[in-house]
A protein has these predicted regions:
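N-terminal cap/lid segment of alpha/beta-hydrolase-fold proteins
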Residues: 24-53
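Short alpha-helix in the alpha/beta-hydrolase fold that links the catalytic acid
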Residues: 74, 234, 248-258
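Short beta-strand/loop motif that positions the catalytic acidic residue
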Residues: 232, 238-240, 244
């Protein structure tokens, strides 16, 4: 069934790419986009533009590890938000899907920047950032590092927290440290581009370069969400399923405590919802819609 859904969606995306932008149900314009980052990487995504945009608001939507712009949460949330009147741009990051990973985490800022630039070029204001799973680390980093004044708020779902700590929770401190030590040793020897076979537990195994490992988990990583959220001075929504076995719901509590003083952080915890919000999609949609409406009406 999952293969069939993926096949049907792939065919749909091909049809979009071969035909001019169309109006779905005469209310939402759907368009395949290809954007080039300032460092020369071409990214693909889907832009959804409602005929009537609620308060002229747009949402840039960022997937998590091994994800893409059309599966998992990205298969339903961008569409649901556009049906509610918000323009959405769901874009592949440069390390999308389950292929080998060689980029550094910090390169993600170029991917998010080109999406924000595109939404601003199209005239959307305010613009919000959405991140799912490891995408939460990406959008928190972008917001904290750039201080982009075009971003009016940040939405997070299923945040995994500090990525080295996540590995410790799966494999224990000794095993997680051994992998990081090996990667750091390779980088120190000028072999940062050497491939390593990395065990990701419930996510399977993947090829990472040593540079990629260190950029995600090293002591100087910029991916730490607890540090980054403390540097964000915009409203934040965090939605977490209480049955999430991939990203501990306690991470949300720690993010709340780490936020800058006086910043309004809304937390929604959904009983029974897992990491992908299976069977609870509407709960997530409702929470995101309510928060966005509240923010755009201010």
């Amino acid at each position: 069934m999952r293969f069939l859904k993926s096949f049907v969606l792939a065919v749909f995306l091909v049809l979009i790419s071969l035909n001019p932008p169309a109006w779905a149900d005469e209310t939402v314009r759907i368009q395949m986009v290809r954007l080039q980052t300032t460092d020369g990487v071409t990214l693909t995504g889907v832009l959804r533009q409602p005929h009537t945009v609620r308060n002229n608001a747009g949402v840039v939507m960022v997937h998590g590890y091994s994800g893409n712009f059309y599966s998992g949460i990205m298969a339903f949330l961008p569409e649901a938000l556009s049906d509610s009147g918000f323009a959405t741009l769901a874009l592949n990051m440069r390390d999308h899907d389950r292929g080998p990973k060689k980029n550094r985490f910090e390169d993600n800022r170029y991917d998010i920047a080109v999406a924000v630039d595109e939404m601003a070029r199209l005239g959307y204001n305010p613009i919000f950032l959405f991140g799912n799973s490891m995408g939460t680390n990406r959008v928190l980093y972008y917001s904290a590092t750039t201080g982009d004044s075009r971003i009016k708020g940040v939405l997070l779902t299923g945040p995994p927290g500090n990525l080295f700590e996540w590995n410790i929770s799966i494999f224990g401190h000794e095993a997680a440290s051994q992998v990081l030590d090996q990667a750091q040793d390779l980088v120190a020897k000028g072999k940062g581009n050497q491939w390593m076979l990395i065990n990701l537990g419930p996510l399977g195994k993947a090829l990472y370069t040593a540079n990629h490992v260190v950029s995600l988990r090293g002591p100087k990583t910029v991916s730490d969400p607890y540090k980054n959220i403390s540097q964000i001075f915009k409203p934040i929504l965090i939605v977490h399923g209480l049955a999430d076995r991939l990203a501990n719901p306690d991470v949300t509590d720690r993010l709340l405590k780490s936020a800058a003083p006086g910043i309004h952080v809304t937390v929604v915890k959904i009983p029974g919802a897992n990491h992908g919000f299976s069977g609870h999609q509407q709960d997530l949609v409702t929470a995101a819609n309510k928060w966005l409406i509240d923010q755009t009406n201010r």
